[in-house]
């Protein structure tokens, strides 16, 4: 048997976007049929060339395997068949005006996925924040607030990822955050983590329970300064949508507030960008032991 031949794929939505995400059927499995990848009809470049170029160019970031293979193209390599970021980017481009990189091709080879995307000329906020004036920082915050408002127009009755795969993110355990069939299942999962930290005496005595009144909205889940690019033309791009999915609207605040090493001038703007949800952030921090250590309990 000869070596495996790379295959070329593309994001696919049925029915085509824009549309409602609340479909009848077995949930969340029905979303995997709605949002998936299919064989590409045409290729941006030969799939074998994508693989070869990533093997001969050094990664831009460590440990993330992102390779710049031409002046306007990068390839992000995942060590498993991970398509949800391509689906997320395609949905965002179709249903919002949030600037994100264009997905040009998906290549599958052996156990790797190669996401071929547009390269954005510019600097991430962690690289240029100190050079921005107070007014410029406020403009960035106002722009991001508008992006969050757009994301919150994308709703779904069932939490989780766009393609029905397991939930991933800073406040999900590594192995037991399987797709949830309902919002109630998600809340029960989190409240079980509360019970675990109480039982193991790893939580403050006044720890609360999870708020299930907030709507499920599309959430980036890693909106840190390294994932926001101020392009050379002044456009503010958002990158790295691999953790995104439909979660309670307070989740965006929690995921942004968790970065202790961010400048205070940035942290002060987070409540304005996402709305203040410090109570839920504190609760997520309080169950950290159950998420990271006691997730099998």
Which role does the model predict for each range below?
Residues 183, 213, 217-218, 231-282:
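Active-site Asp-x-Gly
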Residues 46-51, 85, 208-211:
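Short Pro/Gly-enriched beta-strand edge/turn motifs at strand-loop
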Residues 121, 225, 243-244:
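Short, glycine/acidic-enriched loop or turn micro-motifs at the edges of active sites
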Residues 137-142, 150-221:
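An alpha-helical support segment within catalytic cores of ATP-dependent transferases
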Residues 20, 51-176:
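ATP-binding pocket architecture of kinase catalytic cores
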Residues 1-65, 156-160, 293-297:
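Phosphate/pyrophosphate-binding loops and the adjoining catalytic core of nucleotide-dependent enzymes
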Residues 24, 33, 272-297:
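Charged phosphate-binding loop/patch that engages nucleotide di/tri-phosphates or the phosphate backbone
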């Amino acid at each position: 048997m000869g070596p495996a031949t790379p295959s070329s794929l593309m994001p696919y939505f049925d029915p085509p976007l824009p549309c409602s995400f609340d479909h009848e059927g077995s949930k969340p499995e029905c979303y995997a049929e709605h949002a998936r990848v299919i064989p590409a009809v045409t290729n941006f470049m030969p799939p074998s060339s994508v693989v070869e170029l990533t093997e001969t160019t050094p990664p831009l970031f460590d440990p993330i395997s992102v390779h710049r293979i031409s002046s306007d193209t990068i390839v992000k390599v995942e060590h498993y068949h991970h398509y949800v970021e391509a689906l997320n980017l395609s949905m965002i481009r179709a249903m919002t005006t949030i600037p994100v990189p264009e997905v040009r091709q998906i290549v599958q080879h052996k156990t790797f996925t190669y996401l071929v995307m547009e390269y954005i000329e510019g600097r991430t906020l962690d690289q240029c924040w100190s050079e921005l004036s107070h007014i410029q920082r406020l403009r960035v915050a106002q722009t991001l607030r508008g992006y969050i408002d757009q994301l919150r127009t994308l709703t779904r009755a069932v939490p989780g990822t766009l393609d029905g795969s397991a939930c991933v993110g800073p406040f999900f355990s590594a192995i037991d955050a399987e797709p949830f069939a309902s919002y109630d299942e998600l809340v029960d999962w989190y409240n079980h983590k509360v019970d675990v930290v109480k039982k193991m005496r790893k939580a403050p005595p006044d720890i609360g329970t999870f708020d299930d009144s907030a709507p499920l909205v599309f959430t980036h889940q890693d909106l840190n300064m390294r994932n926001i690019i101020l392009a050379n033309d002044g456009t503010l791009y958002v990158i790295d949508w691999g953790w995104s999915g439909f979660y309670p609207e307070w989740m965006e605040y929690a995921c942004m507030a968790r970065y202790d090493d961010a400048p205070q001038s940035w942290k002060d703007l987070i409540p304005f960008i996402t709305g203040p949800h410090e109570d839920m952030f504190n609760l997520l921090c309080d169950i950290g032991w159950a998420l990271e250590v006691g997730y099998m309990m």
